[in-house]
């Protein structure tokens, strides 16, 4: 059976002026996703994907590097203004916002969207080291 040549589709370049930066800062990792107003992802990066492993993945510097990577990819899509939504208690919360600001993106608002239970599940036990 003859193989048919698969068509190579060129990636459609989106041109979006303003977007939303979703920062998910957990204790172990930081995930930054930049979307358009409708929620379609334009770019994303993680501390682990930036080359950090183990305990170094959960540092503010790793979150800063990940935010720079996601921000540069979003700037290629034309994003200039960004609204920041932070979720989670992790160490990369503040440094990732500073990194986006240092890239030259205009931050219109910063909001904390960390889900807070109305006394739902019992939290994990305290760590004993």
From Swiss-Prot:
What biological process terms from GO does the record include?
translation
Instruction: Supply the InterPro entries for this chain.
Output: Ribosomal_uS11, Ribosomal_uS11_bac-type, Ribosomal_uS11_CS, Ribosomal_uS11_sf
Sorted keywords for this record are: Ribonucleoprotein, Ribosomal protein, RNA-binding, rRNA-binding
Q: Does the keyword Ribonucleoprotein apply?
A: yes
Q: Which Gene3D superfamilies match?
A: Ribosomal protein S11 (3.30.420.80)
What are the record's GO terms for cellular component?
ribonucleoprotein complex; ribosome
Q: Which domain of life is it from?
A: Bacteria
Tell me the SUPFAM superfamilies matching this sequence.
Answer: Translational machinery components (SSF53137)
A molecular function annotated in GO for this UniProt entry is: structural constituent of ribosome
- The answer to whether the entry has keyword Ribosomal protein is yes
Q: Which Pfam families match?
A: Ribosomal_S11
Q: How does it assemble?
A: Part of the 30S ribosomal subunit. Interacts with proteins S7 and S18. Binds to IF-3.
Function noted in UniProt:
Located on the platform of the 30S subunit, it bridges several disparate RNA helices of the 16S rRNA. Forms part of the Shine-Dalgarno cleft in the 70S ribosome.
Cross-referenced PANTHER family: 40S RIBOSOMAL PROTEIN S14/30S RIBOSOMAL PROTEIN S11 (PTHR11759)
Alphabetical list of NCBIfam families matching this protein: PRK05309.1, uS11_bact
Please give the family membership noted in the entry. Answer: Belongs to the universal ribosomal protein uS11 family.
Supply the name of the protein.
Answer: Small ribosomal subunit protein uS11
Q: Which organism is it from?
A: Dechloromonas aromatica (strain RCB)
């Amino acid at each position: 059976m003859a193989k048919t040549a698969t068509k190579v589709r060129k990636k459609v370049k989106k041109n979006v002026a303003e977007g939303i930066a979703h920062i998910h800062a957990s204790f172990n990792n930081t995930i930054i996703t930049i979307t358009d107003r409708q929620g379609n992802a334009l770019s994303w990066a993680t501390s682990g994907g930036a080359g950090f492993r183990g305990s170094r993945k959960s540092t503010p510097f790793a979150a800063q590097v990940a935010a720079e990577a996601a921000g540069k990819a979003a700037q290629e899509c034309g994003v200039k203004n960004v609204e920041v939504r932070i979720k989670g208690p992790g160490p990369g919360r503040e440094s990732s916002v500073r990194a986006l600001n240092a890239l030259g993106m205009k931050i219109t608002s910063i909001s904390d969207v960390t889900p807070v239970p109305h006394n739902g599940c019992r939290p994990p036990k305290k760590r004993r080291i």
